[in-house]
Design a protein with these regions (language model features):
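Mature extracytoplasmic or organellar-lumen-exposed domains after removal of signal/transit peptides
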Residues: 1-201
Length: 201
């Protein structure tokens, strides 16, 4: 639930919404005195951080991105080959991890779609070189925002579907043969289901 109430909400309903809306802080001023990045760059980067994708994730396949979070493929995570995994830049978090978990089945491409839209949008903002965004740039940026929002929402919806199925199977098992272990599994899946469902509200 926290991922939805904080990460998802802050990204799509704040940084990619109010902060990118016409009339909000412009792109021709620094975020704050002494900052070398603009307000728009700051807001966009905040949203990307909430998505949780590793910096080099587009160069990896879905299984590798999934295994990074599961700590099963540290070689793929260690982009700079220094022998350690930097949690700030070489690790998948939050909904980006869940996206890769669905994508590895080969039927979706949420991780790459959202991450690429973030990168393409960032290029538009950076390409303005500290000047106000033009009408065409704003329109293009809104297109990337729409892509991000739609696919991020689908990741959460897929999670609801996944855990609803798990809860159903757990209930069947509990009815057939109750045990504390089976109930603990049910409770875990129920908590996941409730959290993801509430995130969509």
């Amino acid at each position: 639930f926290a991922m939805g109430a904080v990460f998802y909400n802050q990204a799509v309903d704040n940084y990619l919404d109010e902060k990118m809306a016409p009339g909000s802080k412009t792109n021709d001023k620094p975020y704050k005195d002494g900052a070398y990045y603009t307000y728009k760059e700051h807001a966009w980067d905040e949203a990307f951080g909430y998505w949780g994708a590793v910096g080099h994730g587009l160069g990896l396949n879905a299984k590798q991105n999934y295994n990074i979070t599961k700590m099963k493929d540290m070689a793929a995570a260690d982009q700079n080959k220094d022998g350690v995994v930097d949690l700030k830049s070489e690790y998948n978090f939050a909904h980006a991890y869940y996206a890769s978990s669905f994508d590895k089945g080969g039927k979706t491409n949420y991780y790459n779609t959202v991450t690429q839209a973030f990168l393409d949008g960032r290029k538009i903002i950076a390409g303005a070189k500290g000047e106000k965004l033009s009408s065409s740039e704003k329109a293009a940026l809104q297109g990337h925002i729409a892509t991000i929002n739609a696919n991020w929402e689908k990741v959460i919806a897929e999670s609801v579907f996944k855990y609803a199925g798990s809860v159903y199977k757990d209930i069947v098992k509990l009815e057939e043969n109750y045990s504390d272990k089976a109930f603990a599994t049910y409770a875990k899946h129920w908590g996941e289901l409730k959290g993801f469902a509430m995130a969509l509200q």
